């Protein structure tokens, strides 16, 4: 079968390989991927900055954002059936008894990222208990479930932490970044009734800006210093340390900032001491969140259905580029105007 692979730690080793078709073990299923989404993590792996091949393999099959059909059941599987359309979660625990999305590094593997082959192939295998069934009416956009699950968990964590202190009911939110995570954060928070302001670098006539406004949110294409006022909740989705610190300035007393970006090492942060002192004196909370479990995938699908009802084809317009396996290199190229690129693998019969 064909699979999109890299040799981890070797920059620009991306290639399409012919590899053996996998077989499901006990508790596993064989999947026939329909499509996979591509994100910044894939870019880092291709650049040799991250990633690990499974034991005994020189290469790693990419693809952690997947929509697939159940093709074959291994022994002991009774929660899904052949023909079900599903999305798989990403992480699998090793020697960790915590919810898998809270396991520390070294105690888990991740499909298409770390120690476990992904789904950018004609077939893949995964553990059945980490599959979430997709309703027929959401199949066209369900490839977005994985990034949406990250948003769902991040917002859930922020609300849980904020509400553990007193009855905290955020009314306003600042979203930093308008990539898939920033836009999906805006969508979820608008569905929850919050007033949102989304800040990014694209011009006000860009697709990203229009998508924000179509949700009823405010879009700002300038520096954070031009924004007045404070916000109960801040979602940081840029991966810029300076933007994160500047966002803290706009966090209201008793507010919560959730970090969904991944930050580069080093660098000098302007006025960090004053910003942190202000955070202490005003009981501001800063919390990081990564990955997601089954419950947040399920919540994401429920919000997808609600978004379709309220915002029409909004979700489908996040997919700005599609490519096939035979043209896989096009899928793994990036421009500033791309939002979500999808690799089409198998047709849905």
Curated annotation (Swiss-Prot):
Superkingdom of origin? Archaea
Top-level enzyme category: oxidoreductase
List the keywords (alphabetical).
Carbohydrate metabolism, Metal-binding, NAD, NADP, Nucleotide-binding, Oxidoreductase, Zinc
SS bond partners: none
Pfam family for this entry, one: ADH_N
Q: Which GO terms describe its biological process?
A: non-phosphorylated glucose catabolic process
Q: Gene3D superfamilies annotated for this entry? A: Medium-chain alcohol dehydrogenases, catalytic domain, NAD(P)-binding Rossmann-like Domain
Q: Which GO terms describe its molecular function?
A: D-glucose binding; glucose 1-dehydrogenase (NAD+) activity; glucose 1-dehydrogenase (NADP+) activity; NAD+ binding; NADP+ binding; zinc ion binding
- EC number per UniProt: 1.1.1.47
Q: Which SUPFAM superfamilies match?
A: GroES-like, NAD(P)-binding Rossmann-fold domains
Kindly list the cofactors needed.
Zn(2+)
Q: Which InterPro entries match?
A: ADH-like_N, Glc_1-DH_arc, Glu_dehyd_C, GroES-like_sf, NAD(P)-bd_dom_sf
Q: Which residues bind substrate?
A: 41, 110, 146, 291
Q: Does the keyword S-adenosyl-L-methionine apply?
A: no
Which reaction(s) does the protein catalyse, per the Swiss-Prot or TrEMBL entry? Answer: D-glucose + NAD(+) = D-glucono-1,5-lactone + NADH + H(+); D-glucose + NADP(+) = D-glucono-1,5-lactone + NADPH + H(+)
List ligand-binding residues for Zn(2+): 39, 64-65, 146
Binding, NADP(+): 178-181, 260-262, 289-291
Query: What is the annotated role of this protein in its UniProt record?
Result: Catalyzes the NAD(P)(+)-dependent oxidation of D-glucose to D-gluconate via gluconolactone. Can utilize both NAD(+) and NADP(+) as electron acceptor. Is involved in the degradation of glucose through a non-phosphorylative variant of the Entner-Doudoroff pathway.
The record's comment on protein family reads:
Belongs to the zinc-containing alcohol dehydrogenase family. Glucose 1-dehydrogenase subfamily.
**What name does UniProt use for this protein?**
Glucose 1-dehydrogenase 1
